[in-house]
Design a protein with these regions (language model features):
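Glycine-rich flexible loops
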Residues: 1-282
Length: 282
């Protein structure tokens, strides 16, 4: 049984505040929804920051996207509600959807580098395999059409090329967790690449992890082939990224090549020190 409608509206606003505070949406970006009955969905309005939402901002639509009840503030439903409705229709078990632009995950979507597998246990258990849908224009039918082929019975998150992400689950809180875990994982991946090598779980480690996941009541189709090494088969684009070494912090400041020598660094420090001393004496 669903909680009272007013409580669901309040939770929608609270989740919006969390999304905004985490920096997952700027301006009036993003949208989220909750399925409140077989043919009704509660969704965020268009044209408002998720950080400014309150319960009276929420809109109610039918499964065709028509706004079926007047909003007390005159708000109109999000223009991207078609994505939400398509997911609800394909997956009746899904009760909440969040579309957002988490920066680290969106960077992967823009670079169109598949999220690597077999690296971080929490990502494997709570996200599983995350695929990237081809680019489609926001607010058009092409957007849900691009996502639906990637949604299987175990899918809970999809990246949208050059756009953002969409997460979905059995309730709004768990859907938010999926979003938060996604961006945290992508941030860790980017930090790891800056350090250098990436350690991947081997076949045995990955199989054992997926068996634990199954014990948690979270089935994963990859368990059937993990012993053969199917996990991580698309990791190469990520592992091969960052082919150019970062530039060093010191240079001659005249367009010359960067230098890492101790002498050059000490000379630069001395020059700056001399300038500071001279300025203090004036």
């Amino acid at each position: 049984m669903n909680p009272p409608l007013w409580q669901m509206k309040k939770q929608m606003a609270e989740i919006g505040h969390r999304i905004w505070q985490k920096g997952f949406c700027a301006g009036n970006e993003g949208n989220h929804s909750v399925r409140i009955s077989e043919d009704r969905v509660l969704c965020t309005p268009t044209g408002i920051s998720k950080g400014f939402l309150d319960a009276d901002d929420m809109c109610i639509v039918d499964m065709d996207g028509n706004q079926v009840e007047p909003n007390p503030k005159g708000r109109k439903r999000t223009s991207e509600v078609l994505v939400h409705l398509a997911i609800y229709k394909k997956r009746p078990d899904v009760k909440a959807v969040i579309h957002s632009h988490p920066p680290h995950a969106t960077a992967f979507a823009i670079a169109q580098i598949p999220l690597p597998e077999g690296i971080h246990p929490e990502a494997e258990v709570f996200l599983g395999k995350v695929r990237t849908a081809p680019y489609a224009t926001p607010s058009k039918q092409a957007l849900p059409d691009s996502i639906l082929p990637l949604i299987g019975p175990e899918t809970n998150t999809v990246l949208m090329a050059n756009h953002g992400s969409v997460s979905f689950s059995f309730d709004l809180t768990d859907t938010y967790y999926k979003l938060e875990i996604l961006d945290a994982y992508c941030r860790v991946l980017l930090l790891t690449k800056q350090l250098g090598s990436v350690n991947q779980l081997d076949k045995g480690q990955m199989t054992e992890l997926l068996e634990v996941k199954k014990q948690f009541g979270l089935p994963d189709e990859r368990l059937s082939c993990s012993k053969e090494g199917c996990v991580g088969s698309e990791n190469q684009p990520f592992l091969a990224s960052f082919p150019v070494n970062p530039t060093t912090a010191s240079c001659d400041c005249n367009g010359g090549e960067a230098s890492t020598s101790t002498e050059s660094f000490e000379a630069m420090v001395q020059a700056i020190t001399n300038q500071i001393v001279d300025s203090m004496g004036k």
